[in-house]
Structures are given as structure tokens and as C-alpha cells.
Curated annotation (Swiss-Prot):
<comment type="function">
    <text>Catalyzes an early step in riboflavin biosynthesis, the NAD(P)H-dependent reduction of the ribose side chain of 2,5-diamino-6-ribosylamino-4(3H)-pyrimidinone 5'-phosphate, yielding 2,5-diamino-6-ribitylamino-4(3H)-pyrimidinone 5'-phosphate. The beta anomer is the authentic substrate, and the alpha anomer can serve as substrate subsequent to spontaneous anomerization. NADPH and NADH function equally well as the reductants. Does not catalyze the reduction of 5-amino-6-(5-phospho-D-ribosylamino)uracil to 5-amino-6-(5-phospho-D-ribitylamino)uracil.</text>
</comment>
<feature type="binding site">
    <location>
        <position position="57"/>
    </location>
    <ligand>
        <name>NADP(+)</name>
    </ligand>
</feature>
<feature type="binding site">
    <location>
        <position position="61"/>
    </location>
    <ligand>
        <name>NADP(+)</name>
    </ligand>
</feature>
<keyword id="KW-0520">NAD</keyword>
<comment type="pathway">
    <text>Cofactor biosynthesis; riboflavin biosynthesis.</text>
</comment>
<dbReference type="GO" id="GO:0009231">
    <property type="term" value="P:riboflavin biosynthetic process"/>
</dbReference>
<keyword id="KW-0521">NADP</keyword>
<dbReference type="GO" id="GO:0046983">
    <property type="term" value="F:protein dimerization activity"/>
</dbReference>
<feature type="binding site">
    <location>
        <position position="16"/>
    </location>
    <ligand>
        <name>NADP(+)</name>
    </ligand>
</feature>
<dbReference type="InterPro" id="IPR011549">
    <property type="entry name" value="RibD_C"/>
</dbReference>
<dbReference type="InterPro" id="IPR050765">
    <property type="entry name" value="Riboflavin_Biosynth_HTPR"/>
</dbReference>
<dbReference type="GO" id="GO:0016616">
    <property type="term" value="F:oxidoreductase activity, acting on the CH-OH group of donors, NAD or NADP as acceptor"/>
</dbReference>
<dbReference type="GO" id="GO:0050661">
    <property type="term" value="F:NADP binding"/>
</dbReference>
<feature type="binding site">
    <location>
        <begin position="83"/>
        <end position="86"/>
    </location>
    <ligand>
        <name>NADP(+)</name>
    </ligand>
</feature>
<comment type="similarity">
    <text>Belongs to the HTP reductase family.</text>
</comment>
<feature type="binding site">
    <location>
        <position position="134"/>
    </location>
    <ligand>
        <name>NADP(+)</name>
    </ligand>
</feature>
<protein>
    <recommendedName>
        <fullName>2,5-diamino-6-ribosylamino-4(3H)-pyrimidinone 5'-phosphate reductase</fullName>
        <ecNumber>1.1.1.302</ecNumber>
    </recommendedName>
</protein>
Amino acid sequence: MVMVMEKKPYIISNVGMTLDGKLATINNDSRISCEEDLIRVHKIRANVDGIMVGIGTVLKDDPRLTVHKIKSDRNPVRIVVDSKLRVPLNARVLNKDAKTIIATTEDTNEEKEKKIKILEDMGVEVVKCGRGKVDLKKLMDILYDKGIKSILLEGGGTLNWGMFKEGLVDEVSVYIAPKIFGGKEAPTYVDGEGFKTVDECVKLELKNFYRLGEGIVLEFKVKK
């Protein structure tokens, strides 16, 4: 893993997907990665400062976002992008296994402020940045200043789109499983409104590839 000295964390976008780019079936069955790939991901987790997901991933999967498939003496900071502060108070990402940062907007109301107080009493740090939706560029500045210099992005299609659109991703690591899910409503790696032209799109440089279990891993550098 090559670290680039910038005033933002080095972002690795990781995904396990089917050959047709799906993250799950239309019924949210996301059994895609093999055990070998899960170990690969946890090795990356063990070597970064933070793991970032969107609130959609928390609501659908209730992940722990810790290093538990391999032996490790540390867990990265867990970062959840949650514009409307919808995180359930019993979500596993809020447990004491690792530090958690919830990124939400500066928009406020009485109910939201009460929930922030509850989260802070639970030991969760709440960061406010942006109006309407979380300002991802500003969030990266805040996280960098907190000493988080590298992040594994394990987002769904919405957060991934926001990060790619803002030019914040440095590296892409993809496990492709030999499966076809289909379904126009099935979640994909990158959603959002999409780029209008090829000239605007994110361009990648293939750095490495190898077989893993029944699938294949592709590693790319994002061209800046």
C-alpha cells in the first residue's frame, strides 16, 4: 500500500461484487465474498486508521467494522456518514470494540440534538459538516486533522458515488465473484446520478490482479 502525502486521508475503496457489478440481490442477500476474501479485507482493515461506511450499510447489514477475521492488536476508527442521523442506538457499530465517529450535517432540530447527546454519552464522537448532506471534502479535512491518515472505504453505491465524484478515492480494490445477480433494482458498486460523459468519469490504472478462492482480485490506482 503506497501512501501519498496529501492534506487528506489516503482512501482505499474496497468492494466485493458479482461479475455484473452487484453488491447484493434484489432481496439484499449479499453473500458474495469467500472466506479468503474476508481475510484479505481484514488484513487491509488492520493496516488503516479508519473504516468508513454510509448509513445505508449500517441499516441494512448492521456491521461491526472491526478486525476479527485475523489476529490484530488494534481496531481502526469506525466512521459512519449519516446526514439525517438515522443510526440506531443499538447498532453494533456503536459498541465499545472500537472508537466510532458519526458524521452528520450542521442542520439541527431538538430531536437531533437530543440524539447527539445520547450518542456522546455512549462514547461516540459526532462531527457536523455540511448542510443538507455531509460535505465529504470537509469531512476528510476533519478526519485528517484528527490523525486519521488512511481510510478503508466500504461504502454502498451512494457513498461510493459521492467519494468518487469529489475525487477523494486514491485506490480501488475489487473482489469479483463468479456470480450473476441481475436486477435493475439490485445495489451496485457506484450509484448516484453518474457522470454524463466519458471525459468526466473516474479513470483507473490496473496495478495488480490475482486469483483468490473462486474469484479474482483487481487492484487499481485512481488517475488524478
